[in-house]
């Protein structure tokens, strides 16, 4: 697969069911700052690739983590 095919395939692999499973696994808590929907009920949680897709990361449970929107925006692809 070329890089564009890899990126498209991995993005398509991120289903709503997978997103929900990762958030549940992580107890609806940001893996960086520890904020959660229990502390901030309207907190926007996102599922993040630990190793970015752009660097060869895969959309698999062991490469995914729950982050609050603030931490996800501050995280770079490095």
Model-based region annotation:
Residues 35-67, 77-78:
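Histidine-centered nuclease catalytic patch
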